[in-house]
A protein has these predicted regions:
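Acidic (Asp/Glu)-rich catalytic clusters
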Residues: 19-26, 46-68, 94-103, 134-139, ...
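A short, acidic, flexible beta-alpha connecting loop/helix-capping segment that sits on the rim
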Residues: 10, 258-275, 300
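Active-site acidic/histidine proton-transfer and metal-coordination neighborhood
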Residues: 58, 77-176
Length: 300
């Protein structure tokens, strides 16, 4: 099973620190942002410690294509404001070039919200934006991996058919999909009671062959709520059994599965505890840990 989590590449260790954090969770894949997801500051390529990072990946048998990049979620490729849309396009072009520089293959992108536009017009803007990004990065083996969204507000791409339209309109091997379990559940796909039905819809519209990454998250919300609130594995409305089923599904065996579940806090709200080591162990074993929360807090 390929399974890992979001990790940090901040501080002096940079990419080396990201690999070390992933290893501390017994992960064999991981996801990073090139910088803080809420701003545009990025450190120079020369400071990222790329040679050491690549050596560490080889040493621990982590394939470089299983290092996933996530673009900042503040960018919006769907909007009508041309200046803001162009800013998002230009920023993602830089992110794609940085992704290529570190040897990664997949960058996950939130497609965007249509805001004042209709959904159909928002999709037109996304298609236009993605074509511009591809045109500006020829020859780079980096795949733009569009995330399935929950449909919060005016978010696009909460329905598989919307992603199908984008894929068919652009018709490029560099446009693929990131399947998010929380988002799809919140948008109305019933993984719990209609697992094979969801798989069938996925395959008939997007095509399983077009999935490149899976975000494995439980959901704090009810089916079809269109709210997007992640929960720890087994602590939400999707539940451990269904999420483990996805992780162990042979149809997804080749795909990196990335946890984006929330950190836990102590009673003061100040100290935080990453849940990933315990959640990864639980999913690998395919056995629910009744003491999950205590084990996370006590790092057992």
């Amino acid at each position: 099973m390929k399974i890992g989590s979001h990790v940090s590449n901040a501080g002096d260790l940079m990419l080396v620190g990201a690999v070390q954090e992933a290893l501390s969770y017994d992960a064999n894949c991981f996801m990073i942002y090139h910088g803080a997801p809420q701003n545009s500051y990025r450190k120079p390529i020369e400071q990222l410690r790329i040679p050491e990072y690549k050596e560490l990946l080889v040493k621990h048998n982590i394939k470089i294509e299983d290092v996933i990049i996530h673009a900042p979620y503040i960018l919006n490729l769907a909007q009508s404001d041309e200046e803001k849309r162009q800013y998002a396009v230009d920023f993602i072009i830089r992110e794609v070039k940085m992704t290529a520089a570190i040897g990664a293959k997949y960058i996950v992108i939130h497609p965007g919200s249509s805001l004042s536009l209709s959904l159909a017009d928002g999709l037109v803007q996304i298609i236009k934006s993605l074509k511009e990004i591809l045109a500006a990065t020829p020859g780079l083996d980096v795949v733009l991996t569009l995330e399935t969204m929950a449909g919060k507000g005016t978010e696009t791409c909460f329905d598989f058919s919307q992603l199908k339209k984008i894929i068919e309109e652009i018709h490029s091997p560099r446009i693929k999909v990131c399947l998010d379990t929380c988002h799809t559940f919140d948008s109305g796909y019933d993984w719990v009671n209609d697992y094979e039905g969801v798989i069938e819809k996925l395959d008939k519209t997007i095509g399983i062959q077009n999935i490149r990454v899976i975000h494995v998250n439980d959901s704090q919300n009810t089916l079809g709520s269109r709210k997007d609130r992640h929960a720890n594995i087994g602590q939400g409305n999707i539940g451990f059994v269904t999420l483990a089923k996805i992780c162990h599904d042979e149809r997804f065996a080749h795909l990196p599965k990335i946890l984006e579940t929330p950190y836990l806090h102590d009673e003061s709200g100040k100290k935080v505890y990453p849940p990933y080591k315990q959640e990864i162990a639980m999913l690998k074993a395919n056995v629910y840990n009744e003491n999950l929360i205590d084990d996370i807090i006590n790092n057992r």
